[in-house]
Structures are given as C-alpha cells and as structure tokens.
Swiss-Prot record:
Main location: membrane
Keyword DNA damage: no
Gene name, Swiss-Prot/TrEMBL: atpF
Protein name: ATP synthase subunit b
Species per Swiss-Prot/TrEMBL record: Alkaliphilus oremlandii (strain OhILAs)
Assembly and binders: F-type ATPases have 2 components, F(1) - the catalytic core - and F(0) - the membrane proton channel. F(1) has five subunits: alpha(3), beta(3), gamma(1), delta(1), epsilon(1). F(0) has three main subunits: a(1), b(2) and c(10-14). The alpha and beta chains form an alternating ring which encloses part of the gamma chain. F(1) is attached to F(0) by a central stalk formed by the gamma and epsilon chains, while a peripheral stalk is formed by the delta and b chains.
Membrane disposition: Single-pass membrane protein
Similarity comment: Belongs to the ATPase B chain family.
Task performed by this protein: F(1)F(0) ATP synthase produces ATP from ADP in the presence of a proton or sodium gradient. F-type ATPases consist of two structural domains, F(1) containing the extramembraneous catalytic core and F(0) containing the membrane proton channel, linked together by a central stalk and a peripheral stalk. During catalysis, ATP synthesis in the catalytic domain of F(1) is coupled via a rotary mechanism of the central stalk subunits to proton translocation. Component of the F(0) channel, it forms part of the peripheral stalk, linking F(1) to F(0).
Entry GO MF terms: proton-transporting ATP synthase activity, rotational mechanism; proton-transporting ATPase activity, rotational mechanism
HAMAP family: ATP_synth_b_bprime
InterPro entries per the UniProt record, alphabetical: ATP_synth_B-like_membr_sf, ATP_synth_b/b'su_bac/chlpt, ATP_synth_F0_bsu_bac, ATP_synthase_B_chain
Compartments in which it is found: Cell membrane
One Pfam short name: ATP-synt_B
C-alpha cells in the first residue's frame, strides 16, 4: 500500500500548484464573476423597483383619468339637463306668448264684431224708423204733431230692437 499513496515532493508541488491556482482563479475569476453577478442582481432589482413604480404611477393616472371621465360625464349630463330645461322653458314661453296673442286677437275680433253689430243696429234702427214713418203716414190718416209722431216711432224702434236682438 505504500506504492499507491506516496507523499513525495511531487505531491506537495501539486498541492501548492492547486492552492496557487485556486488563489489566482479566486482573485481573477471568482471575484469579478461574483461582482458581476452582484451588479446584475442589483440592476435587476432596480429595474423591478422602477417597473413597480411606473406601474403604480400608471394606476394613479388611470384612476385620475377615470375620475375626470366620470366628472366630465356628470358635467355633460348637467349641461344636457340644463339645455332641456331651458328649451322646455323657452317652449312654454312661446306657447304662453302665442296664447296671449291669440286672446288679444280674439278680443280685437270680438270688439270689432261688437262695433259692427252696433253699427248695423244703428243703421237698421234708422231704416226701421224710416219704414215706420212711411208706414205710419200711410196707416194713420190723421195728422199728429211732430213730437207725438217721433215718440211713437221711438217706442216702435225700441220694441223692435229689443225683440230682434234678444233672440
């Protein structure tokens, strides 16, 4: 068994070479790789934090936009409702003005009809009085004085006018 494991100078040189190689690799390879990995991990963590921040900001902006949109919709509804109320009010004013104008026109027409009626009655009374005078002169052969004659005609006209216009 002595031949299988021997502790001669080669063994110690190999052990020393391995140790030196380990220290050289540690200094030139493992340490830069570890630093690179740490930097990369830190960069990834910063990217994740930045992405979360951006996500949070975008959610806040989304909430603000939704709030503004809701406010705009509410304002739009108020404007439409106000426009409808104004239109309804204006329509009512137009209808009211038309009603007033129609009543005024009816009153004017009624007054005009009343004037025409009065005018026709006066003309008719004049014609009736002339007819009554002519009839009275033919019927009454006797001679009446002018005032009695006029009084009789006026009574006839009044009775004829009342009877005629009451119907």
């Amino acid at each position: 068994m002595l031949g299988l494991v021997s502790f001669d100078a080669t063994f110690f040189f190999q052990l020393a070479n391995t140790l030196i190689m380990f220290l050289i690799l540690k200094h030139f390879l493992f340490q830069p790789v570890t630093e690179f990995m740490d930097k990369r991990t830190k960069a990834i963590e910063e990217s994740i934090a930045e992405a979360e921040l951006k996500n949070k900001e975008s959610n806040e902006l989304k909430a603000q936009y939704e709030s503004k949109l809701t406010e705009i919709k509410k304002e739009r509804t108020q404007i439409i409702d106000e426009a409808v109320r104004n239109a309804q009010k204006r329509g009512d004013e137009i209808v009211s003005a038309a009603g007033v104008e129609a009543r005024r026109t009816i009153e004017k027409a009624t007054a005009e009809i009343e004037r025409e009626k009065q005018k026709m009655m006066n003309e008719l009374k004049g014609e009736i009085s002339q007819l009554a005078i002519a009839a009275a002169q033919k019927v009454i052969e006797k001679d009446l004085d002018q005032s009695a004659h006029q009084q009789m005609i006026q009574q006839f006209i009044d009775k004829a006018g009342e009877t005629q216009w009451q119907n």
